[in-house]
Regions:
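Surface-exposed strand-loop-strand hairpins of Gram-negative outer-membrane beta-barrel proteins
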Residues: 1-17
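Outer membrane beta-barrel transmembrane domains
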Residues: 81, 156-254
């Protein structure tokens, strides 16, 4: 739903990631990219007496996973329509290399949503376009991941589709910035080969601000702050009040 409810167990999840992106332009209109996400996930909560047989008297309970997540490979082709509107079409695949067998301190496998990998190979599709408006750039895109089936533990992640609109100012050589409005829609997950997983799926709207600097002609640094505008999620789910991201981009010469 879209209402806040008490978090009696004081549960929280810290999800940190470092993504290395490598792109190579085969031609001016055809590019291949690889995304390598290194992830660290820490979930912690306070259990009441009897909630967990391994910690019967209650207390703090931690679950964590870390390592290289699922690698994404993508090919993008750019075409111009109506003599001036560039359209970038992307097609790729999410690999299943990330670990999905991390355990807690008692040797019990932690839930699929806390693993760094998914255990399935899924296609990813995207379409993106941009248009210069004086000193601004207006852009937008749609990105989707289609779940193809269950992993070896019988868990199937829901499909995801994300729509976003950006307005960026890039005229200044040293500083640039922009805002983004995005919508994320996720369908339900399934476990044990077909059972509906509660507390998963729903839709969210976000507002994101961005600021960056061009340190050199080849090197950029960037920071983004994302805040939820509205969230309508299935059952009860943990939500984040904001997300901060730091990034850098280096352009290699040819």
């Amino acid at each position: 739903g879209d209402r806040f409810i008490p978090n009696y167990n004081k549960e929280r999840t810290n999800n940190s990631s470092l993504t290395i992106i490598s792109s190579y332009g085969i031609t001016d209109h055809f590019t291949i990219s690889a995304f390598f996400p290194f992830r660290y996930i820490l979930n912690q909560k306070v259990l009441f007496r009897g909630q967990n047989p391994n910690l019967y008297n209650g207390g703090k309970y931690f679950r964590e996973s870390y390592g290289l997540g699922d690698v994404l490979l993508q090919a993008r082709i750019q075409r111009t329509f109506f003599n001036e509107i560039p359209i970038v079409l992307g097609i790729g695949v999410k690999l299943s290399n990330g670990k999905i067998n991390m355990t807690d301190e008692f040797g019990e496998r932690i839930s699929d949503n806390l693993q760094v990998g998914t255990g399935t190979v899924d296609p990813i599709l995207s379409i993106y376009s941009s248009q210069d408006i004086k000193k601004l750039v207006l852009s937008g895109g749609v990105f989707t991941r289609i779940s193809t089936g269950e992993n070896i533990y019988g868990y199937k992640y829901g499909n995801e589709i994300q729509t976003l609109i950006n307005l960026d100012y890039i005229e200044n050589h040293l500083l640039y910035g922009g805002v983004q409005v995005s919508h994320l829609l996720s369908t339900r997950d399934y476990y044990e080969y077909g059972k509906i997983s509660r507390d998963r799926g729903g839709e969210s709207y976000f507002l994101t601000g961005k600021i960056g600097t061009k340190a050199t002609d080849n090197l950029d640094f960037e920071m983004t702050l994302q805040m939820p505008l509205h969230q309508n999620l299935n059952e009860s789910q943990l939500v984040s009040p904001f997300i901060i991201q730091f990034g850098s981009l280096y352009r290699f010469g040819t």
